[in-house]
């Protein structure tokens, strides 16, 4: 079964996208995220502890108010090099129409150089559910209850 296809409007802010580098694409048929590239003019080196805000060369507009997008790290960059998102996860509301920027943070032990056009993050579009808050005095009991961090163990 194939996934639903929804439109995502983009403005190309860097003319190298779509010519020198591909537009954001899914790496495989089953990929959930579109690969985002670093729209840099020159290589950028992140030394351990540094964080920088990088342009992806695009602006986006989701149009559909039942959708949002999240910017997520690329697993290989984080695991192999310690390069993660400086803000953990970037949440993009459907009414945002500005440039798509990515905060990269080097939490590793060695300097890491990002080349112009490198894939630096991924964009995943998700459905949202808006809720109405119900103030209650007690909750209906669940199996977990108030058990928090580490409550279920590791084994």
From Swiss-Prot:
Reaction(s) catalysed by this chain, per the record, are: dUTP + H2O = dUMP + diphosphate + H(+)
The record, for InterPro entries, names: dUTPase, dUTPase-like, dUTPase-like_sf, dUTPase_trimeric
Would you kindly state one Gene Ontology biological process term found in this protein's UniProt entry? Answer: dUMP biosynthetic process
Q: Name one GO molecular function term.
A: dUTP diphosphatase activity
Q: Give the record's keywords alphabetically.
A: Hydrolase, Magnesium, Metal-binding, Nucleotide metabolism
What function does the entry list? This enzyme is involved in nucleotide metabolism: it produces dUMP, the immediate precursor of thymidine nucleotides and it decreases the intracellular concentration of dUTP so that uracil cannot be incorporated into DNA.
Q: Which family does it belong to?
A: Belongs to the dUTPase family.
Q: Which PANTHER family match?
A: DEOXYURIDINE 5'-TRIPHOSPHATE NUCLEOTIDOHYDROLASE (PTHR11241:SF0)
- What name appears for this protein in its UniProt entry? Deoxyuridine 5'-triphosphate nucleotidohydrolase
Q: What is the lineage of its organism?
A: Bacteria, Pseudomonadati, Pseudomonadota, Gammaproteobacteria, Lysobacterales
| Gene label | dut
């Amino acid at each position: 079964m194939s996934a639903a296809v929804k439109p995502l409007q983009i403005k190309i802010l860097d003319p190298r996208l779509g010519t020198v580098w591909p537009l954001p694409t899914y790496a495989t048929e089953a990929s959930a995220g579109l690969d985002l590239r670093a729209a840099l003019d020159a290589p950028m080196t992140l030394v351990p502890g540094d964080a920088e805000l990088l342009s992806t060369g695009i602006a986006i507009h989701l149009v559909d108010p039942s959708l949002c997008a999240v910017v997520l790290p690329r697993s290989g960059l984080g695991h192999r090099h310690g390069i993660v998102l400086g803000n953990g996860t970037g949440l993009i509301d459907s009414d945002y129409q500005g440039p798509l920027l990515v905060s990269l943070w080097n939490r590793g032990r060695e300097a890491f150089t990002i080349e112009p056009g490198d894939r630096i993050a991924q964009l995943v579009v998700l459905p949202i559910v808006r809720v109405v808050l119900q103030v209650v005095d007690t909750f209906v009991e669940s199996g977990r209850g108030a058990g928090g961090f580490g409550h279920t163990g590791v084994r």
